[in-house]
C-alpha cells in the first residue's frame, strides 16, 4: 500500500486512512528530494561569504567591518537585483521545459545574461564611489575608505553573479540539482584553501579575502558553463544564438519586476548595518550586528531550501486538485522546519559566549554578540517559520500578497521601530536589530499565518487546476504577458 501511494501523487481516500506516521514518512521523502540538494547548495554559496568574513575578522575589527560593509551593502545592493532578475528564469525555463520546447531554455538563459551584464555595468558607479557614498551615510572615515578599497576588488564578483545565476536556474529547471550541488561543494573547499593562501601565505590581507571570493565564484560559474557546453544538455543548449535578442524588451520588463520585489525584502536588513554606523562605538556595533546577521543568514539557508520545497509540493498538489494533500504537505514541511530551527536555537543559547570566536578574536565583540544571543535565537526561530509560510503562499500563486506584506512589515513597521528602539529608546545595536525582528519578521509571520488560516484550500485547488489548463500553451513566449 505504501509503495503504491508513494508513486501516486494523488491524495486518495486510502492514503487518508493510512497510519499518520506512514503518511508523514511518504511526504517527507517527497519533500527532501527537493530540500536536500537545495540546502547543501545554498549553504555552500553562503558559506563562502562567511569564510571571507571570518578571515577578515581575524585580521582586525576595522577589516571585519570593511569586508562586511563591502559584501553586505555594496555587493548586496546589486546581488539582490541580479538574483531577483535571474529568478524570472524559474518561470520561463520551467514552462519551456514542461512544454518540451527545450531549445528555448538556452535562449532564455542568453537573454538573462545580456540583461544582467548590462545591469552590472550600470551598477559600477556604486563600487567606484563606494567610499564617498559610505561617508555621506555616516560611516567613519577609516571604515569607509577601506570598504571602498575592498569594493573595487569585488567588482569581478558582481559580474560572476550575472554569469552564474542564470546557469543555476537553467540547470535546476531541468531537474539537474545534483550538478550544482557537487560543483558548490568543490568550490567551497577551493575557497577555503584560496583564502588561506591569499590572506596568510601571500600576506594580501583583506584584499586577499576579496580576491578569493572573486576567484571562487568565477570558478563556480565557469564550471557550470563547462558542464552545459560540453554536450551534457544537447536539447537545451546548442550554442549562442541571435534569437536571444528576439522578444528582448518583454523579457527585460518581466525580469525587472522580479528584481524589484526581491530588492525590497533584501535591502531592509542591509539598511540596519548602515544605521549602526551612526551609533557610539560604531565599529564594535557593526561587527556584532554583522556576526549575528551572518549566523542568522547562514541558518536561514536551510529554511529557504524548505521554502523552495514547500512551494513545489504545495503547487504540485494544488495543480492536481488535491487540497487535503496540500494542507498535509504544508503541515509536514512546517513541523520539520520548526524542529530544525528549535534545535539550532538551543545550540545558539548554549554557545552564546563562544559563537563570535568563529569570526573574531576581539573580546569586546565577543561580549557584544553574547549579549545579543537571545535576539539571535529569536531570529533563528522566526526563520524556521516565516519562509515556510511564504513558500505555502507562493505555492498557491499569491506572490503579490507576499510582496505587499513584505513592503508593509519591513519598511512601514520594521525600520521605523528599529530607529525608535535604537536612538530614541537608547538601546543601541540590540534595539535596532530587535526592532526589525519584532516589527518586521514577527509581524510578517503573523500576517502570513492569518492569510493561510483564512484561506479556502478547496477553492484554491480548483483555481490552480483551471490556471494549469489556461497556461498549457505550446509557446512559452506568450506567457510573459499573462504573468505580468
Indicate residue ranges for each PLM-predicted region.
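Hydrophobic faces of transmembrane alpha-helices in multi-pass small-molecule transporters and flippases
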Residues: 24-47, 151, 155, 174, ...
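Interhelical loop/hinge segments that connect adjacent transmembrane helices in multipass membrane
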Residues: 2-36, 206, 210-218, 222-274, ...
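Small-residue-rich hydrophobic transmembrane alpha-helices
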Residues: 50-53, 64-124, 128, 164-173, ...
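Alpha-helical transmembrane segments of multi-pass membrane proteins
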Residues: 77, 125-126, 141-167, 182-183, ...
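Interfacial segments at transmembrane-helix termini and the short loops linking adjacent helices
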Residues: 25, 134-154, 278-287, 351-377, ...
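Membrane-interface helix-loop junctions in multi-pass transport and translocation proteins
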Residues: 24-27, 177-222, 226, 284, ...
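Hydrophobic transmembrane helix module of multi-pass membrane transport proteins
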Residues: 2-4, 116-222, 226
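Helix-terminus/linker motif at the lipid-water interface of multi-pass membrane proteins
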Residues: 46-65, 134-141, 197-204, 259, ...
